[in-house]
Amino acid sequence: MKLFIDTANVNEIREAHSWGIICGVTTNPSLIAKEGRDFKEVVNEICSIVDGPISAEVISLKAEGMIEEARDLAKIHKNIVIKIPMTAEGLKAVSVLSKEGIKTNVTLIFSAAQALLAAKAGATYVSPFVGRLDDIGQNGIELIKEIVQIFKNYPDIKTEIIAASIRHPIHVIEAAKAGAHIATVPFKVLEQMTKHALTDVGIERFLKDWEKVPKKS
């Protein structure tokens, strides 16, 4: 499974990229707004750090506006992927953009039916929201499993599944077990994934043992 980082903070992106584990970035208007910087400036800088798919979201709600924004965003860098909301208008936009060779990531997916429609419209990626489904008492990982099964049934579907709205390391592991192609993970969760109490204990023990080794004067 591939790992993307879900943030617009360039310091977090640089750090995670230095670990050699991420191959893409997802952003959204909320994440960009937190940075307090010009949208295109942030996206440009992200593209200079990570040589992989960089998702940038449109804000228009009508297909015509989405298409216009998408064409403009696609000019920023060859790695730009356009995030489109899962609506009927969004599907119209995805259909047009896919024919123009512009990659799309259909976001805010909460059902297998939505994922199937997005794939049929030509989406490069679909992003089912695991955590938000869990928040309302549904099972986000079960949705990933459903979508994976449907896509496997039809080899002509080339759309990749991005497990999104990841809240903790267990979500990442369960998404991997379910067969998601990608998980897009907040930096704090990536940090959590590096840690285990027994690892810390082991390091401390090694250092104490090393101190006991006679040193040549």
UniProtKB/Swiss-Prot annotation:
Pathway assigned to this chain's UniProt record: Carbohydrate degradation; pentose phosphate pathway; D-glyceraldehyde 3-phosphate and beta-D-fructose 6-phosphate from D-ribose 5-phosphate and D-xylulose 5-phosphate (non-oxidative stage): step 2/3
Recorded catalytic activity of this chain's protein: D-sedoheptulose 7-phosphate + D-glyceraldehyde 3-phosphate = D-erythrose 4-phosphate + beta-D-fructose 6-phosphate
A Pfam family of this chain: TAL_FSA
Any GO BP: pentose-phosphate shunt
Subcellular locations according to the entry: Cytoplasm
Family annotation (SUPFAM superfamilies): Aldolase (SSF51569)
Keyword DNA-binding: no
Entry keywords, A to Z: Cytoplasm, Pentose shunt, Schiff base, Transferase
Gene Ontology MF, one: aldehyde-lyase activity
GO cellular component: cytoplasm
InterPro entries tied to this protein: Aldolase_TIM, TAL/FSA, Transaldolase_3B, Transaldolase_3B/F6P_aldolase, Transaldolase_AS, TSA/FSA_arc/bac
Signal peptide: none
EC number: 2.2.1.2
UniProt-annotated catalytic positions: 83 (schiff-base intermediate with substrate)
PROSITE patterns: TRANSALDOLASE_1, TRANSALDOLASE_2
Record's function text: Transaldolase is important for the balance of metabolites in the pentose-phosphate pathway.
Matches recorded under HAMAP family: Transaldolase_3b (MF_00494)
PANTHER family on file: TRANSALDOLASE
Family: Belongs to the transaldolase family. Type 3B subfamily.
Protein name, per record: Probable transaldolase
Organism of this sequence: Caldicellulosiruptor bescii (strain ATCC BAA-1888 / DSM 6725 / KCTC 15123 / Z-1320) (Anaerocellum thermophilum)
